[in-house]
Design a protein with these regions (language model features):
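Metal-dependent phosphohydrolase cores
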Residues: 15-188
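Single conserved hydrophobic/aromatic residue that forms the stacking wall/gate
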Residues: 1-14
Length: 188
């Protein structure tokens, strides 16, 4: 029996979502590699690059700038939650946040140092922070990034800014955020 289009779409999403139950320290690199291989060609949130291109571009730019390994790895893995989230991937039609930063951090925290996990967990907060503290930053955001910002709570309040500034990894998180923003170059 042929599947209906809707049933086929549900089936595809189920087989595309990675199985994280059996991930361990011996297979985490293969697990991440398989995500890039299987899903890296997916659209990146209304941008003109794929998800894989976006993540690799950020890491490549960090490496070319001679950043430390934790920044390079943070830039590479910051959006891994788009692939591991129970809620699926973001689209421009979304009306609710999908919390990909939390989904990614939940996987990474078992295998990577806290700084890597923090770069994933707080890169959305970093965008909200930069929008609240630097008006020029907001002006540079893409249409897709503004859309996701609105779903993610908009610019931080003054109270949120003060709380976020207490994070001991603030500088590195903000650095990864800037590579996140930069990694959207078609044909790089």
């Amino acid at each position: 029996h042929p599947r209906s289009s809707a049933a086929s779409d549900v089936y595809k999403r189920q087989i595309m979502k990675p199985d994280i139950k059996n991930v361990n320290s011996k297979n985490i690199v293969d697990f991440i590699g398989s995500i890039f291989e299987r899903r890296g060609g997916e659209e990146y949130l209304g941008e003109r690059v794929t998800m894989g291109q976006h993540m690799l571009q950020g890491a490549t730019m960090a490496e070319q700038s001679k950043e430390p390994d934790d920044i390079i790895i943070g830039a590479l893995l910051h959006d891994i939650g788009h692939f591991t989230s129970e809620f699926g991937t973001f689209s421009m039609e979304d009306k609710e946040d999908r919390y990909h930063e939390d989904a990614g951090a939940a996987v990474l925290e078992h295998f990577f140092p806290k700084i890597i996990t923090d770069c994933c967990r707080y890169h959305v907060a970093a965008k909200r922070y930069l929008c609240a503290t630097n008006p020029e930053y907001f002006q540079k955001l893409s249409i897709a990034s503004v859309h996701s910002l609105n779903l993610q709570g908009g610019p931080m309040s003054k109270t949120e800014v003060k709380e976020f500034e207490r994070n001991p990894n603030l500088k590195k998180i903000l650095t990864v955020r800037l590579y996140d923003d930069a990694g959207k170059i078609p044909d790089m």
